[in-house]
Amino acid sequence: MGERKLYPRPELVRESWQNLCGEWEFDFDFGKSARERGVPEAAHLEKKINVPFCPESELSGIGHRDFMNACVYKKKLMLSPERGRRILLNFEAAYYRTEVFVNGRSVGMHVGGYTPFSFDITDAALAGENDITVICEGDPRDRTQPSGKQSGKYASYGCMYTRCTGIYAPVWLEEVPDVYLRGMRLTPDIDGARLNIHAFLSGKGEKHVKFEAFLCGRSVGAAEASTVGDNIAASIGLSELSLWSPEKPTLYDLAVTVSSESGCDRVKSYFGMRKIEMDGACLRINGKRIYQRLVLDQGYYGAGIYTAEDDGDFLRDIERARRLGFNGARLHQRVFERRFLYEADKAGFLVWGEYANWGFDHTAEGMLGYFLPEWTEAMERDYNHPALIGWCPFNETWDAHDGRHQNDALLRDVYTATKHLDPTRPCIDTSGNYHVVTDIYDIHDYQQDIAALHRRYDSFEKEVFENRPGRQQYRGEPYMISEYGGIRWTNDESGWGYGDAPKTLEEYLERYCTMAEIMAANPRICGVCYTQLYDVEQEQNGIYNYDRTPKFDEATMNRMAEAMRAPAAIEKE
């Protein structure tokens, strides 16, 4: 059985915490009647589940693959509430609508399937044994609920996969003083050698906050500020400036102390100093042109579905991608766990932040309120990560089955909100199609005919290739091929992929390497993203199998990596 043991929130760490992953009581709630049946007040549930794995997964111990509109969890906790202390119950993610009860009393509800949430359970907690009940409701067939690649049919099909209901990410408990740090926005200013901080606080009364930055254990700057409000701004001038880049991903440590009458809240964090700029056809990091050699990573983990079996899986996937010459990934159609982004920060592995927009009705009016709240939660969660170089809230906003087009106003409003919340990174409004307003013009091109690809991109200087002419217009933005390849390579004839599968390994290798060479040779292409790193269920066009075993020998992978790492035209100054 899988185990998740590491602290789930590496960018805001407290020494004292309690991991609640492991065995919980569980039951289905097919009729969504748990509240009416008094389940929050009930003593026990019939089944056992291994949290944080969803009930559809093998690792959960349940393995129920049919639709379930709701499910219920219970756990007994020994607590010792103290005067001047607060008890926070934290969930990294649960699909889709989650209500939490402590000793039969509702302490909060979260709507959304992909972002973390926290409830202060102090006032409902008792000294001694406490009963925690969690009710999760979600249906990927509900078009107001973004559900990503979760299948809306009974079985998986094509590029739609097994569903994920209820809790699927770590659950944990921490105690804090009455006055504590809720979060921070860290904005690097490399030109001024400063870190600008906006901290969010909880609790009443006067608060004094000290921030201190460290590089390799040496103090390199500090700032202090006081407030009676719930947020505070500060700026640290750095005596030593070491930039974060893919080649040298330097990270600073950041110590934060919040002092008040209730005591001290001490938090450890980190940051990277880097700047992203768009310059004509290219992107720059710290003034240097970059060519994005990305791979599509869908965040599926076999026996755990949405959930990695152990915390080391995140770094291992990054290392698999780097082994093949990729310098980053599209984190596709879901919000990845924070520990993945932490490993990306440490490795200098570039990522794009996406959202699980599939399953959501992007054609109807009045849908912004269903989409924007959780999208902005995801942005706030991941804003501080130096490895994250761009946002992409939508992917392939196709016409509805009845022919209705996407709601352009929805995409424009989400783009505008994204740029308002984070003007430091580029935003792609909807990857592939149909662009309304975008910082980077990206397309998806699964052409398998090499001669056709040559014709398409060799003539690029004269005429830009648009994959959806008449529905979107190229206006001179940086140009990116954010999905290509998808070459099927499998012994399973039922496996799904793009185009005709190569008949021999040499044919596969020739196609793979030539695709990479054609795109890298074009001086107007700022990046590519190969589909995909590993197979996912029946979609068998990955470079690795679903269990992450390699499909190819070392010599073949070396040739693939060499083709991907070859210098790109856009990298030349």
Language-model features, listed with the residues they occupy:
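Short, aromatic- and glycine-rich surface loops/edge beta-strands on solvent-exposed regions
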Residues: 131-134, 248-260
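Active-site-adjacent substrate/metal-binding segments within catalytic domains
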Residues: 55-79, 83-91, 95-103, 108-111, ...
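Accessory carbohydrate-binding/adhesion or oligomerization-edge regions at the termini
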Residues: 1-59, 135, 141-144, 216, ...
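Signal that preferentially marks extracellular ectodomain short beta-strand elements
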Residues: 119-123, 234-249
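Substrate-binding/catalytic cleft of secreted carbohydrate-active enzymes
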Residues: 198, 316-319, 328-552, 556-559, ...
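Surface beta-strand/loop "capping" patches
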Residues: 175-205, 461, 564-573
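Beta-strand-rich binding/interaction modules
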Residues: 100-102, 193-226, 232-236, 254
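Accessory beta-strand-rich segments of carbohydrate-active enzymes
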Residues: 6-11, 16, 25-31, 63-180, ...
